Every structure is written in C-alpha cells, then in structure tokens.
Design a protein with these regions (language model features):
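Conserved NB-ARC/NACHT P-loop NTPase core of NLR-like innate immune receptors
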Residues: 1-191
Length: 191
C-alpha cells in the first residue's frame, strides 16, 4: 500500500455564520468522526469514548475529545495523517476567558506538542495579529497569500469592470465612475 493510499485526511472549516463550526469542541468532534471512519481499530477508540459517556447520553468535554483524538493519532502503523483547518480567523475572538479563539489556538498548540512524526497540520487564516503570534512558534513552513498590493489591484479591476459594464451607470460621467471605483476599492480593505 502506498503512502497516498494509507494517508488519513480530515478537514474542518470554521464558519463565522455557523456557531456549530467555531470552537475546539466542534473541531475535535469533526476530526474524530472523520478519522474513525477509516478503520475498525480507530472506530473502536471512538466507541470507547461513547461508552465512557453513558452511551452518548452525556456529551464529552473538550478534554475527553482531545484525549480520544490523541489516542487515535498515537495508534502505531498509521500512515501520514493530514489535519486541515480552514479559516481559523472565523473562530470568534469573543469575550470569554479564554476566548473561543484562544482555546482553539491552545488546542492547536497541544496537537503540535504531541510531536507525532506522521501528523501534519495545515491551518489557513487571514493574518490576524493574535493568530500570527500564537502560531509563529509552532509552524515549520508558512505560505503567505496576503499580498495587499495584488489584492487591492484585483479588487480595483473587478469593481472597474462592474462599474463600466453596468447599464445603470452608462449615463454617469467618467470622473464619477472613477470616484466610485476609488472609494469602493478603499473601503473594501482587502476583502
């Protein structure tokens, strides 16, 4: 069996519009389900967690979920395990102490500290200060796609094409169209 065939992949997308996709508990639950579906041995570990919590009548806390994930990841003989966490910045930096985002960053740090040679993490996020500071000591490779000048040009080009092709704006003077493009590009702030 090749590495590609034996590789495990689990994916989680943080979504600011869906509170069920914004915290450590949701992340860990999703990763556990995805990984345990790959083999009976992994499913048995998850079933143990289920049994510990009165066959599902009690919800496991984040500590129990993390312990279960750790047990699954530590099973010998597994191929490469890729955990992809997309849009971490959509995990709210709320008023909780610690905030949902801080808890998530601590969970990621704990995953890295496991030091498992077959575990690979890929985390995507906008370059928000707290995330950058927390992840900086943990990353071994970083790809920055945040090129403000290129992003601003793309936004400007898009707005320009919409403004100049919109039938309702045909009668507008060119300098008014240019002002709209300039202001919208400015207000978009890279979004």
């Amino acid at each position: 069996m090749s590495d590609a065939e034996s590789a495990f992949l689990a994916y989680f997308y943080f979504d600011f519009k869906d509170t069920a996709k914004q915290d450590s508990r949701a992340l860990l639950s999703s990763l556990l389900i995805q990984l345990s579906n790959r083999s009976d041995q992994l499913c048995d570990v998850l079933h143990g967690l289920y049994s510990e919590h009165q066959d599902g009548s009690q919800q496991p806390n984040t500590t129990s979920l993390f312990r279960c994930l750790k047990d699954i990841l530590a099973i010998g003989g597994l191929g490469p395990i890729y955990l992809i966490m997309d849009a971490l910045d959509e995990c709210p930096n709320d008023s909780g102490i610690p905030s949902s985002r801080e808890k998530m960053l601590m969970t990621l740090e704990e995953l890295v500290q496991l030091g498992l040679p077959n575990l690979r993490l890929c985390v995507t996020s906008r370059p928000e200060y707290d995330i950058r500071i927390a992840l900086e000591p943990l990353v071994t490779q970083q790809v920055s796609l945040h090129d403000e000048s290129g992003q601003k040009k793309d936004i400007n080009d898009y707005i320009t094409s919409v403004v100049h092709s919109d039938g309702k704006m045909k009668r507008w003077r060119d300098d008014d169209k240019d002002m709209v493009v300039e202001k919208l590009t400015q207000k978009a702030d890279g979004m």
